[in-house]
Amino acid sequence: MASRRMSMYSVTSEGMGGPRGAGQQSTSVSTTTLLNAIHNIYLASQPYRLDAGTSLVVNTWLTATQAGPDGEVGGTVDPALAARAWEHARRRAEDGCIILGSLHQSTPSVMKPFLRSFPVSLPSSVFKALEALDPFIHCVAPFNPSAPRHAALGVTLTMNLAGNVTAASIALSQAGIDTAAGLLSIPAEAGYRAFDVFYHLLSSASTPAEREFLGLKSASSYALLARSGTYDPPSYLPTADDGASADDLRAALKEIGIKGSSHRDFISTLAALLKLGDTLDYTVDEEVLEEVCEDVGGLLGVDPEVLAKQCTTEDRQTLVGGLYEALVDWVISKANQAIQAQLARIRDGDESSDGGRGARTPNSAEDNGDTVCLTILEVPDLALAKALAMRGIFDDSQGINSEMKQDGVEVASAGQSVLRETQNAVVEAGPLLGDMSGPKGRDRQHHLEKREEVLEKVGIVADDDCFFKKLLFPVSGQGIQLGQAGRLDIQGVLGSSRAWYHLSIHPTDDSPASLAALPSINSAWSAGTVSRQLRAWRLPEWANRRNKNLDFTADFDVEEFVQRYSILGCREGRDGIETWILERGWSNGEVVVGHERVWMRESAWWEAENMLDMKPMGDMPMGASNLMAPPGVMAMDTGYSHNGSGYFPPINDAASNGSRDQLLHQRNQSQATLAMGMGHSPGVAPSVAPSGLRNVSKGDYGLGGKGDNHRDEILFNNEGEFVGALDPELANNKKIEEQQTSKSRRMWVALVWAITFWIPSPLLRYVGRMKRPDVRMAWREKFVLCFIIFLLNAAIVFWIIFLGRLLCPNFDKVWTRDEVKQHQGDTDFWVSNRGKVYDISKFWKIPHGDVGNEATQDLMQPFAGLSMDAYIPPPLFKACPGLGIGDRLALVPNATETENSAGMHISGPGQANPTSGLADANWYPDVFLPRMKEYYKGELVWDASKINSEGQNQDHKWVIYDNKVYDLRDYFSTLKTMNNLAQYKFLDDSLTQVVERNPGTDVTGTWNGLLSNAQRNNLTTYTTLRNNMNCMDNYFYVGTVDFRYTARCQTNNYFLLAFAIIMCAVILLKFVSALQFGSKRRPSPQDKFVICQVPAYTEGEDSLRKALDSLTALQYDNKRKLICVICDGVLTGEGNDRPTPKIVLDILGVDPKVDPPALPFKSVGASSEQLNYGKVYSGLYEFEGNVVPYVVVVKVGKESEQSKAKPGNRGKRDSQILLMSFLNRVHHRAPMNPLELEMFHQINNIIGVDPELYEYLLMIDADTCVREDALTRLVASCASDAKIAGICGETSLQNEERSWWTMIQVYEYFISHHLAKAFESLFGSVTCLPGCFTMYRLRTADKGKPLIISDNVIRDYSDCYVDTLHKKNLLSLGEDRYLTTLMTKHFPYMSFKFNPNAFCQTAAPEKWSVLLSQRRRWINSTIHNLVELMTLKEMCGFCCFSMRFVVFVDLFGTIILPATCVYLGYLIYTVASGTGPFPLITLIMLAAVYGLQALIFILKRQWQHIGWMIIYLLAFPIYSFILPIYSFWNQDNFSWGNTRIVVGESGKKTIVAVDDEGFDPRSIPLQRWDDYALANNLPGRRGGAGPTEKMDHVFADAYEMDDMRSVYSAARPGSVLTGMNRNTAYMSPNSPAPYQHMSRSPTAYAGPTPYSDNPAARQSMVSMSPYQDTNHGRMMSMSNLRNVANASPVPTRAGTAMGFAGGSRAPLGQSEAARQSTMSFDFQRNAAGPDDFQIVDAIRAVLMEVDLDTVTKKQVRALVEQRLQTELVGERRTFLDRQIDNELANM
């Protein structure tokens, strides 16, 4: 056996990436970057390589129960670590120890899966032994369904250098098992169980005789098991059944030799332990104690008296724990015997090493006798694992670190905090490490001594031949050896072995039960939980320490080094070694020559070993050949070798563990070059900035220095005159074009000129400074629109305020008696008299009256609101002259009207007090009437129906004459009272008879007839009648007929009321639509692919970062969302210190030295502005543990634009069109421009998602923050309603209290969503989906018909010629609203919805000027868009509430906002001044409007909005008057370009002057992706078929080629469009997280690297290094795959061998079936492949193996294709689906 290398604590430190050229890592690893990378590998079920000797994996019980390609379960492990450990052991003839450490109590065991991934064949008995041992050392706990209760368990493998296992053993560490937690002191909480073996015992399907002999009962009958009340395994486990597990255990025990009498002794001991546990209660009854001890003594062969009398309760407790641990040791010893027996059979040739699955292992005669030991040490104890790892990594006082320091290698201190934590960890785990000096150690020592004493006391008196004694005394005559014999000395193993670390992380603190409900096995994730584990173990410091300073995985004595590598040119002596190192291109950091040793990093060592492998065996130097691969064993595949060396199996498509559902599992590469050749093709622009402006040392992303130091430069000539502007008026030297004008446009122009003909154009040109005809025309159009708006507003004000007065004058100057009665206040004191209404509020309090009759307030108060006719009658002889009435004659008034005698004012001779002024007969006409005239208000009116009713029904003697009402009731009653005395009958009988016969009627005609006849026949009679009529007017007149209810007066009111009712109905509907009381349950996770588009213009860094962070943090599957940032030009916003694209790229963590080429595409612009250039960047962005792919497109403009202020800027609409057009061409598989081809390549081949998979487009603004669940809610809404084409959520303000201007917007934002949009959403026709937060469906769910990416929408939305006022307002101001209008126009039967539960926040304008500008755009675009909507045909709904009507209401409401404000001001004035009737209905409507809104706030518990509503109302004049007026008048306030000038419109033609070279569409080459990919050897070709069904696991568009690079930006081959330099390429950096710690500098060894022109890109995978961080080497031809399929003896697991980046993975979309498939057929084009019978057989075989209750059809299809080793498409896919249904139906 080869000698052991002592104190080899080498922990390798190569990063996840490929070999580093520098000696030190350039970037430190932080917790965030490490957290990001861990999340990536968790999603991909891959390991993460922390350094060359350390791997991290993430596992849960879910991942541990998933079957791998070999059909076994166990979770994620790193086979590469096992392979590295083996290669170091065999090549260096040194022992190794792989520590499987757990960082969390919930992590499952990975011992068995790790052993299965080992690069040598292990005997099957090893796995059977571990299977048998598991129930003894694991138990159920709430935090882990298989919680380990042992400190450490080791499997030691002794192998010869040929890779044959010569010996193997299993052993517990000396710390043993925690029997307290697993048996004696189970927590009395639900969810805990004892060791699983006891439940298996009770559930075992043993014979009845066996159960009777053991006396077994239910688990609840045993005190040891009944503490927690949990007896069954967790129900969430897919195979949770103690009975089945018991059968498996019995079979496993039988395999390792525990059968027959041994099995009976074994189960007897277990039963005895259960029974003995019933005696551990201090209060146990003595009889019960004796009975139990009698039973236990019989099972164990021990005298019951010893157990009952000589052992205390504590002794029995110690006995139970010690005996159980001794039983476990016995099981392990039996297992080791079985392993040795199998190995003996293998050596004898009777059995193969892998149980018959492979070739026979050569016997011992075939090896040279040297052996090495590899110990796989599982350390589930958190404290022990942490102590072992941190001491080995950070402690410089021992191990390899100490040896390096002594040899002169600079070893930086780990830092005081790290060393302190390391020391604390070692102290904490001291007893487990054998250190008994501390308090815990002394307690542990006391426990062990006590246990030995009790076991010896009981064991001595046991029967000599009993099993019990054999357990306690396995070696006769040596006493109790428990914890020593057969145990593993961890300190000794580590002291003689090279240590490797395989650390298991758990992704969440959630209970295991909660994981069962997750949608996928990799869904559980808590960044805080993982971060806590990383920090607790100091893994960032670990990575930085190892990778920066101590990345040495091999070390040699100087002589040994020379001897081994002399054949490669290494010469003797230190100088010879250093010279050879320099020749190899290794820096001092890669190979360090110490005082006595040479220390090598992993990459350098493998390069040297690779060169040795390439040498013929005969050339090997002495001492080296025996360490090389022996005959018949393939050498390791290092990636640097050409013949391989047996390290890794061939890594190809079939070996990568990725799928399109597993994004972020590979390191992304961006595809651009650092430099271009001197020449370039016309189709591609050179780098944007001239070389003289580019900061090559610091990097500027290839965007130049514009905006960083000098902004908005204006070019002037030597004379200081502005240059570059066109002649704005004349079209000289310009190309003249003629365009057809639509009929509607011609009619509008005619109307404009008809209204504005009187305004001369010279006046506009010279006074208004409008030199251009199109600008003047826009002003005229604006004038006409404002004039029309003014007329509408004036009409509204006139209609509401003045029309009613014109139709019904004096309607507010009359009152009924009841209305008069309402005025009884101290300041509102009204009375009526003789048909007149008086307001005596200023009179009644004034003392007045005669001597002795002074009127006071108390006396006057009762008369308020009353009629004073009976109280103040005129003298009858004065009121009725010419009728012969005596001066004392008076009528008797109605008694009911003169109840208060104090009010009687009898004037004239009838006054009883001659001294009173009333005694004057002229007091009434001369004093009373003139004074009352001062307080006259109007006429008293009577309802005609009331007059008629009382006259006809109550014999009320009153009539109507000429609309005057005369009441003769007192006249007739006085006559009746006076018996018709002649003196009281002073009225003409002809008149009174009419009244008597027609009371309550209109007698105008009758009386007029009497007057006419008298006038014709008898003038005396006529004179008498006239005197009668005069008397009527003076004495009997009581008012006029109420005219306010006539048709003339009511028509306008009814019109207003009708509109009021309609408005109220709309408001009520809006209110109802806002009352959505449904629960806000979070929808289930969605699996749709979504592009999150963020157009960036001049936003600041804070806004951009918040927007990107919010998208990254969305609670949506990270692999199914893509952030697409489109920077609209290279320009610097106000307050920024650099251009917006640079800010975006800085945030995303892109390397500033990256300079992708500028690629042409067609923009939305006039003439030559349609040609634009853009750059594409891609990578990963990390925030709070979420890692999301991104694509950034920067519009950089043509070369001629670089001197302008805004190169590349074409507007937000162009940014939207850029992506929409790309997705349109992806959908139709149409030819693409170079920029789109590069975008397709970045998304499809680098990010790994077929762009056709994306189903939704989420549009947000760069200053918008989206709530975490918003995207899920929007997608869920669309998933539940396939008719939804667009949907938006609620937008609120994030800066609501920043200024007064933001405060007045809060309420408006809330109510515009919860009333307006919620109401429109009822019709499925939200008229404005805001661009700041809207999601569109890309294609219909049923037939895949394109929606927002349809040709019609893109054609209308990308109108390049925006040269009229209407188009300007549509496409330049309100592009978001117009996009909604176009969607509604082209897809009228689709729905556009509002989801109030999807929430985002945006930044509102904080300054008045900004608010003014924003609202100008909004208001004007609203008007013009609603006009467009009014013209649509399919806008009708149900009843009158059609969508067209709602649109009309919105349009009209926007236009008449100023009138609304004026009317509200008028109302306030009217109410405040009391100059008119109280507007009750209007105020009720206003109260209803805002009351319902307030009710919404209250019901939604948004109390704060009540306050915001008050602030909004205070600012109402601003919103309804100032902003609209300003907006209307500034409709033509645009920047008018000089490229195309409309110089005139005549008839059907528009004359346009063009001042540039124009745009030739042929200047932008177009090519289909498949043709482009085929011509340039790119993967991801999709074939000619249309879109196919997208599956979760298997995709029909598997990669076909052996490379993933962009023709525009990858190094090889040069772009067919750019002809770029072939010597350089760049690696696109990821976000500041995952891989900043990996150097990107190329190395000088082993030929080209991924960062140079790598010729290995097309080589067989045998020659590709798993260490190379590249995607080039991942692929190989199918023929090469088949040639090397069996080249390596190392078995491969699914997934790569080198973790996240060390081994390449397929991008998302490469499924497991695709990885294992070696061919892909389209049976429509290729007749090869399986026939129908083979497919049916495969389906039946798969259905026999899967769980039909949980498996999905897609999974069955994937498994069938995997079994067939073929991907089925076309008709074969259809047949497969149909046959699966048939088989399921027949089962």
UniProtKB/Swiss-Prot annotation:
Among InterPro entries, the record links this protein to: Chitin_synth, Cyt_B5-like_heme/steroid-bd, Cyt_B5-like_heme/steroid_sf, DEK_C, Myosin_head_motor_dom-like, Nucleotide-diphossugar_trans, P-loop_NTPase
Cellular component terms (Gene Ontology): cell septum; myosin complex; plasma membrane
Family annotation (Pfam families): Chitin_synth_2 (PF03142), Cyt-b5 (PF00173), DEK_C (PF08766)
Q: Which parts of the sequence are annotated with region: Disordered? A: 1-26, 345-367, 1628-1657
Q: How does it sit in the bilayer?
A: Multi-pass membrane protein
**Where does it localize?**
Cell membrane
* SMART domains with a match to the protein in the record: MYSc (SM00242)
Q: Which GO terms describe its molecular function?
A: ATP binding; chitin synthase activity; cytoskeletal motor activity
Residue positions with a glycan: N164, N643, N657, N668, N695, N894, N1018, N1420, N1533
Q: Which SUPFAM superfamilies match?
A: Cytochrome b5-like heme/steroid binding domain, DEK C-terminal domain, Nucleotide-diphospho-sugar transferases, P-loop containing nucleoside triphosphate hydrolases
Q: Domain named DEK-C: which ranges? A: 1729-1785
What's an example GO BP annotation here?
Answer: chitin biosynthetic process
Q: Which UniProt keywords apply?
A: Cell membrane, Glycoprotein, Glycosyltransferase, Membrane, Transferase, Transmembrane, Transmembrane helix
Null allele phenotype: Does not affect vegetative growth. Does not significantly changes in the chitin content in vegetative hyphae, nor in conidia.
The set of disulfide-linked cysteines is none
Q: What is its main location?
A: membrane
Reported EC number(s) for this entry are: 2.4.1.16
**Residue ranges of the TM segments:** 747-767, 783-803, 1055-1075, 1445-1465, 1478-1498, 1506-1526
Q: PANTHER family annotated for this entry?
A: CHITIN SYNTHASE
Family membership, please give it: Belongs to the chitin synthase family. Class V subfamily.
Mind telling me what this protein is named? Chitin synthase 5
Which species does the entry assign this protein to? Pyricularia oryzae (strain 70-15 / ATCC MYA-4617 / FGSC 8958)
